Curated annotation (Swiss-Prot):
Keywords (A to Z) from UniProt: Amino-acid biosynthesis, Cytoplasm, Diaminopimelate biosynthesis, Lyase, Lysine biosynthesis, Schiff base
Pfam families in alphabetical order: DHDPS (PF00701)
Family statement: Belongs to the DapA family.
Main localization, broad class: cytoplasm
Single GO cellular component term: cytosol
Protein name (database record): 4-hydroxy-tetrahydrodipicolinate synthase
Its biological purpose: Catalyzes the condensation of (S)-aspartate-beta-semialdehyde [(S)-ASA] and pyruvate to 4-hydroxy-tetrahydrodipicolinate (HTPA).
Assembly, per entry: Homotetramer; dimer of dimers.
Phylogenetic placement of the source organism: Bacteria, Bacillati, Bacillota, Bacilli, Lactobacillales
Residues annotated as the enzyme's active site: 140 (proton donor/acceptor), 168 (schiff-base intermediate with substrate)
PROSITE patterns cross-referenced by the UniProt entry: DHDPS_2
Binding sites annotated in the UniProt record for pyruvate: 51, 209
Disulphide-bridged cysteine pairs: none
Length: 311
């Protein structure tokens, strides 16, 4: 699918990777999970991102995952492949492999983690990746995980590259507003923060790359529809009920909470791979009560004063 198909996507789900108890990928679980997403307003799917536990996946496993999901999706929604690493050469080799593999509207490349490059180093990293193949690139800017932040000024330099088509922005709403105001017209801006989706869409973002859409896609769609129809009272009411659910989804290192909920719902999401571990049983029960049932008492116990463990 093309850029134009991607431009129509408001809710892009950052898909989990289902695992067996022995840690191998559970390919048999994928069809039911995909159909669930598509039935609940997922417009596009990101594979091999943070929520997929990509640091624990080999490139060969990622390619197997890509093939399995493409077979199920069968062109119904655009797909994005996670292609970035903190090694520019490895990223180039993999983006070329994914481009040859085919079937993706874009590749998502994360800001290099651990190395702590300068702004010029980050600029050259993404420019070199974007120069390497015809696969359009979306930058993933998430300083809470990678320590360094790609500034809006550097992002706008990269936005002029013809093969860099957008950003998944996980910094501040102020940065997002600045980017939306100054970006090239066709440059796509997604928030990667479910809790900020309401504000981002009102600022003029193109959509959200989401974890919560695994479990709460219907209310996200309803909120976005209300925003599009200028029914801000309705949209804000949905957001007020949505925020505690998002907080619960990130009250333990992600994707452990969303996997606990999906397992509860009858899907074979399975465990996380080490070094991530499942949420403790009592915490998982509270998370499920918040996200699935909207239980106020569980909300207070689960999210009051919680600091996101990935930030």
């Amino acid at each position: 699918m093309s850029y134009q198909d991607l431009k129509e996507c408001k809710i892009i789900t950052a898909f989990i990777t289902p695992f067996h108890e022995d840690g191998s990928i559970n390919f048999d679980a994928i069809p039911a999970l995909i159909e669930h997403l598509l039935a609940h307003h997922t417009d596009g799917i990101l594979l091999a991102g943070t929520t997929a536990e990509s640091p624990t996946l080999t490139h060969d496993e990622e390619l197997e995952l890509f093939a399995a999901v493409q077979k199920v999706v069968n062109g119904r929604v655009p797909l994005i492949a996670g292609v970035g690493t903190n090694d520019t050469r490895d990223s180039i080799e993999f983006v070329k492999e994914v481009a040859e593999f085919g079937g993706f509207a874009a590749g998502l490349a994360i800001v290099p983690y651990y190395n702590k490059p300068s702004q010029e180093g980050m600029y050259q990293h993404f420019k070199t990746i974007a120069d390497a193949s015809d696969l359009p690139i979306i930058i993933y800017n998430i300083p809470g995980r990678v320590v360094v932040e790609l500034t809006p000024e550097t992002m706008l330099r990269l936005a002029d590259h013809p093969n860099i088509i957008g950003v998944k922005e996980c910094t501040s709403l102020a940065n997002m507003a600045y980017l939306i105001e100054h970006k090239p017209e066709e440059f796509l801006i997604y928030t990667g923060e479910d809790g900020d989706a309401f504000h981002a869409m009102n600022l003029g973002a193109d959509g959200v790359i989401s974890v919560a859409s695994h479990t709460n896609g219907d209310e996200m769609h309803e909120m976005f529809t209300a925003i599009a129809e200028s029914d801000m009272k309705k949209a804000a009411a949905i957001q007020r009920k949505f925020i505690p659910k998002v907080n619960a989804l990130f009250s333990y290192p992600s994707p452990a909470p969303v996997k606990a909920i999906l397992n509860y719902m009858g899907f074979e999401a399975g465990p996380t791979r080490l070094p991530l571990v499942p949420a403790p049983e009592e915490d998982a029960k509270r998370i499920i009560k918040v996200v699935v049932d909207g239980d106020y008492e569980a909300t207070k116990a689960t999210v009051t004063g919680v600091l996101r463990p990935d930030y």
